Regions:
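Alpha-helix termini
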Residues: 41-42, 46, 60, 77, ...
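Short, cationic-aromatic polyanion-contact patches
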Residues: 14, 38, 72-88
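Beta-hairpin "wing" of winged helix-turn-helix
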Residues: 29-30, 34, 62-71, 77-78
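Extreme N-terminal segment that seeds HTH/winged-HTH DNA-binding domains in transcriptional regulators
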Residues: 1-35, 41, 87-120
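Short, mixed-charge, low-aromatic patches
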Residues: 10-16, 50-59, 70-76
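N-terminal helix-turn-helix
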Residues: 36-67
């Protein structure tokens, strides 16, 4: 798993880890049943606290991206194409909701927001 985090990114470390793993699952970079590194190993590799990785793993499990078997570790969940599409849409909506909300607080109209999104895309 090729994952990196930046302490100065403005996004909590656990969320950066969550996003990286979720993205890898959705894009097929991580296969169903594939083992994730143990929490301590991932923390060492990413140079973050065990708590940050544990929090990310718990959120990923809660959202159905991974499963954890006591004593065996955490593994990528078996997800159908439809389930992956739903998870992808949910993550996009979550991120866009935050951004659109901020733009609205600046007084931007729907048309202005759509124009900016189109420019960025």
């Amino acid at each position: 798993m090729n994952l990196s985090v930046k302490d100065s990114a403005g996004t909590p470390l656990y969320r950066q880890i969550y996003d990286g793993v979720a993205r890898a699952v959705i894009n097929g970079e991580l296969s169903p049943g594939e083992a994730l590194p143990p929490i301590r190993t991932a923390a060492e590799e990413l140079r973050v606290s065990v708590i940050s990785v544990k929090h990310a793993w718990e959120e990923l499990e809660r959202d159905g991206f991974i499963i954890t078997a006591v004593g065996r570790g955490s593994f990528v969940a078996e997800l159908s194409k439809e389930e992956l599409a739903k998870k992808r849409a949910a993550l996009m909506k979550e991120r866009l909701y935050e951004g659109v909300g901020f733009c609205k607080s600046l007084g931007a109209s729907e048309e202005e927001i759509q124009k900016v999104i189109k420019e960025l895309y």
